[in-house]
Amino acid sequence: MSSAVARFDVQDPKELIRIITEVVIAHLEGGGAPVAAGSAPADVAALIDHTLLKPDATRADIERICHEAARYGFASVCVNPWYVPLAERLLRGSGVKVCTVVGFPLGATLPKIKLAEADQSLTLGAREIDMVLNMGALRSLEDDLVEAEIRAIAELCHRAGAICKVILETALLSQHEKVRAALIVKVAGADFVKTSTGVSAGGATLEDVALLRATVGPEMGIKASGGVRTLSQLHAMVSAGATRIGTSSGVKIMQELSGNTG
């Protein structure tokens, strides 16, 4: 965390984290300015990562979500690495990016394996990588390891012209751990911090999104994932600070927006 410490007159990284955490939580308790959530269909669609990460997803399922994503103009489709080549072929020229996951869903894969997984996915056509942070290392206070792993994948993504998002799995972390993790992700150079895998017991909450926004500031991306199934939930997450929504309910949300729920 030396790059973060250099910006403050604090020598101990743990003390730096403690100070920033207290400031962030105090800011959150005092309320913050909400982010406006537009309702134009193109604006809403551009927020959505159309997601299908179920282990039993078939080629037909992937074809369906790719066609849906192209029809509505979603930001990306998020699929397991096995389906990256198929999604890339189906979406080529559509403007919809292919997103995939690394170290999913536990985040406990060895760093070199995560890096290789990201590298091959990028080679196959992924342009957004959602990697899972090593929660065990984070909770064991091995911040240097966590930062190094994220930095390596973020730099790999950026060399390929791709985006790196880091999943925290907020449902498993304390408030202080969420803040610490988000700061590490920011210092490591990732583009987004993401709340959840959607596999664990809890998904995105408004409180967590607001906490992450207060932590990383106004410029960094925040992806809310897990449990966002309606237009009102999407707007609430954006108002709390999310700039991307991971959901398998993208079509339902767009139909709700147009008044067609049939």
What spans do the regions from the language model cover?
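Short hydrophobic "strand-cap" motifs at the C-terminus of beta-strands
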Residues: 225
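Protein-protein interaction and targeting regions used for scaffolding, dimerization, and localization
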Residues: 1-38
